[in-house]
Amino acid sequence: MRKKLLSSLLVTAMAVTMLAGCGSNGGQQASTPATENKTETSAEAKTDDTAGTDTASTTTTEGGKIGVAMPTKDLQRWNQDGTNMEAQLKEAGYEVDLQYASNDIPTQVSQIENMINSGCQMLVIASIDGDSLGTVLEQAKEKDIPVIAYDRLIMNSDAVTYYATFDNYMVGTKQGEYIRDQLDLDNAAGPFNIELVTGDPGDNNARFFFGGAMDVLQPYIDAGKLVVKSGQTDFETVATANWSTETAQSRMDAIISANYADGTKLDAVLCSNDSTALGVTNSLEANYTGEWPIITGQDCDKPNVKNMISGKQSMSIFKDTRTLASKVVEMVDAVMKGGEAPVNDTTTYDNGTGVIPSYLCEPVFADASNYKELLIDSGYYTEADLK
């Protein structure tokens, strides 16, 4: 059973998403390219964001047509998710319409509407904002088009058939446990200073990440073993709109200036993912002169793995998108053939209309001691990628 903190965060999530409304943009990422009003192309096709809408495959196949909607090409992980899924679906005999929406909600809504009207028989959607797709998905429901929410749960829509993701609560607990173990919180005298940085408030996953980590760390904060010098501990305060590197960096700049400029030691920064960890690292390099703190992350993006190798980031949760893509292809194939998708969780993920049957893949963490085995030996990256 999830603990009280996670339950509280999810109640808050429901309130936030109800207030967000359809089409709410929630603030866009500061690093968004100037051409982001354009529809992004398939990562397999042109990578120029000005290239316009791209249908990833136009060849008719016997398997049927699957629409795959990804949020943005701004983050490396979504490129990998999209291309991995596209390749595996094509290999399984399906035509694929893969679209990226440049983190623009109206663009994603339009892309999904086009998928519905162009004959897609099933949709796989990684939403930009979990509460923004209810209206367009009513159209999918009316046409009996099954929907798999991919990695981000789509909220308040009974059109969602399945959810495929990694165990997001476990992601957070692994990050919290890493900090606990590295600081030896059960034995060391302390106190230790920590700051907290999590993700987009419109992304339901961010609350699971933060909830899992805080279920590990909160007892040490309550006991005074961990001290948040900034005083910023509630989810809404430590959230980072659009997981923006620049936003995380600006916030960390202010925290360092107010709390650590006098030489006070910062021992750890809980970062829920790699884009926020990169912002924290950039800020520390520019503003912090003390001993380097523990920094967590998630996704094993190339710049962050390079930072792990050089000692600037301590760890990153590795979510092998090939594994998730493979599972989604299994789910799609089962449903398209008239069966039920394989799931392993039927209790955890309630999107406001009921519990969504889910398949959860298990994450692992990478650090300087095991990244070669996890990332290079497995073929996820080459050594040249990390030079």
Language-model features: locations:
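A residue-level marker of the well-folded mature domains of exported/periplasmic proteins
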Residues: 2-5, 18, 22-387
